[in-house]
Amino acid sequence: MIISPGTMRLADWRAVQEGDAARLDAGCRAAVEAAAGCVAAILERDEAVYGINTGFGRLASTRIEPADLATLQRNLVLSHAAGVGEALPAPIVRMVIALKLASLARGASGVRWETIEALQGLLDHDILPVIPAQGSVGASGDLAPLAHMTCALLGIGEVLGAAGREDAAAALGRAGMAPLVLGPKEGLALLNGTQVSTAIALTGLFRAERLCRAALLTGALTTDAARGSDAPFDPRIHALRGHAGQMAVAAALRTLLAGSGIRDSHRIGDPRVQDPYSLRCQPQVMGAVFDLLGQAGRTLATEANGVSDNPLVFAETGEVISGGNFHAEYVAFAADQIALAIAEAGSLAERRIALLVDPAHSGLPAFLTRAPGLNSGYMIPQVTAAALVAENRMLAHPASVDSIPTSANQEDHVSMATHGAMRLLRMADNLSHVLAIEYLMAAQGIDLLAPLATSAPLGRMHAVLRESVPVLGEDRLMAPDIARARALIESGAAERAAGCDALPELDA
């Protein structure tokens, strides 16, 4: 895949994360070299410019001698490589490098083309720096984690190779790459930027989208298992309100439930007038979820295509101007939006789970077992779902409101985008378990309604689960069933089995 700076779509970044080979468009070289020429001209004029021949942060007024400029950049990288915690997963690191390439290649950072080639070499040879997940406050960019990325270019620290962790210098040597000697401004350009928080937030976005699509599948299966009505999904209702996500979700639910024998069995003469909100209001809730994910996706797509360095080089005028593009507030807000979407999707799913185990609402045997009392059935999986949803509600607290000043109050407002994005991965794990539990229970409900049959799409989704998880008769160990159902959701196998083309998609 070609990385074309400024024009990448979400689908392109998804491909990078999933392991597609990525190479920067060579047409960017002229812009990169023009900006590097501006930096060289500033040094020729002996002009004091932040990040080129000055200190950093609160030390910006300290002038650095020409003989010390290479040491300045190296010291910057080493001193800022202060991250802690678990290493970021390889797919995220791969996306971090690709995002940094796309930003530098816009020709506003002043780095040399050979530095671009060194970064490209990490991707080409799958040399992935070990980047600790903790230590960034999301302004001035993701300094600590990007310093760890840059250390690998210098042959310092560890990288992830085919055989696990190894010395960066050894990995570079095996790939025929020499450790990079940083030129003026290059350390700052590599460290400044929102690429880590953006890569993590994109990962959270992609998982949230996949899981929320799965939530429509499990929600439809639950609706049929609980003998819910499809009348609330009538397109006329949703057209009157006008929200795109709501209309799309209603259309998906109509498609999923069309032709259900279970629905036809109670279409006439059903004494129930209205279903509980967790069934009836799925378009309104999940529509809002998808619209929120869409908004977050558009924000992150813009961020991924932008330049978040400082200062910025404007080659057409020869100016170098300090600003604040490193501030990741947009990413932090997007991460907070994704967190809200994940939390609400799980909250709605848990209420459907609770409905299924309650005979008063579902009309099914208590806890979905034919012999309640002797068997507990699905009693405790509902408790597990409640615990996971409670945790996600706590994690959904906005990260962006928790600014803590840094760098002796020079950097006195920060975004906290990076840990705001990191919590999305845990929240997605929790949601996938909740949906796995709903999948199991809704399928059990369908079995308890036999010989009535569900719709064709939901029937295929039910059948693929039954290939690895049998109907629950007597009580058995539940954890393996949850794990198998979760694997079908995370892999997309459940969605592929349903074969529904009407599920909403991100389009940024």
Swiss-Prot record:
Pathway: Amino-acid degradation; L-histidine degradation into L-glutamate; N-formimidoyl-L-glutamate from L-histidine: step 1/3. SUPFAM superfamilies: L-aspartase-like (SSF48557). Signal peptide: none annotated. This is Histidine ammonia-lyase. Transmembrane segments: none annotated. One of its GO terms (molecular function) is histidine ammonia-lyase activity. The gene is hutH. Its main location: cytoplasm. It catalyses: L-histidine = trans-urocanate + NH4(+).
